[in-house]
């Protein structure tokens, strides 16, 4: 164990003595690699990264000229507005499918009941349903009771 350490030391000493600027430069990446800084941080910081020249010259005044601002305004995209057609349907997770929205849907014929949870793509407006016979406010309850009463005879009146 000690022998190994000794040989390592002598090797280092030999390398240090015969150092030329070229070998020094060659060794530098190896030395920085052993440092404890994570590679992402190391890559960003330090003089090794070439400094990109800024858009403005250093001695120029800081305020922008009118021509520069107009050029900038052209470059900036207009505020994002989702298209009137193509609605996002939520599937499991964060993925979304786009579905063509029908003209009726755009004009507001369908109910607000079309939420991301409903499996049916389209529903008829609740007001329209309430007008139709057998589709009133408690239609589902009534139909359920009707189905049950058809199966067995009506119960005897209470005494």
Curated annotation (Swiss-Prot):
Protein name: Protein B1
Compositional bias annotation for Basic residues: 1-15, 85-96
Comp. bias regions, Basic and acidic residues: 16-31
Gene: B1
Region span, Disordered: 1-100, 133-159
Transmembrane segments: none
């Amino acid at each position: 164990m000690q022998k190994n350490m000794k040989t390592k030391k002598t090797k280092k000493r030999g390398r240090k003595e015969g150092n030329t600027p070229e070998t020094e430069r060659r060794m530098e990446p190896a030395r920085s690699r052993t440092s404890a800084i994570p590679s992402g941080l190391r890559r960003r910081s330090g003089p090794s990264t070439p400094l990109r020249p800024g858009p403005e010259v250093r001695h120029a005044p800081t305020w922008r000229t009118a021509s520069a601002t107009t050029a900038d305004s052209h470059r900036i995209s207009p505020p994002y507005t989702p298209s009137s057609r193509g609605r996002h349907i939520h599937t499991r997770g964060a993925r979304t499918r786009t579905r063509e929205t029908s003209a009726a849907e755009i004009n507001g014929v369908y109910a607000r009941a079309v939420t991301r949870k409903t499996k049916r793509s389209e529903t008829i407006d609740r007001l329209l349903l309430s007008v139709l016979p057998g589709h009133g406010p408690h239609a589902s309850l009534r139909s359920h009771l009707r189905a049950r009463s058809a199966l067995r005879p009506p119960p005897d009146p209470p005494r």
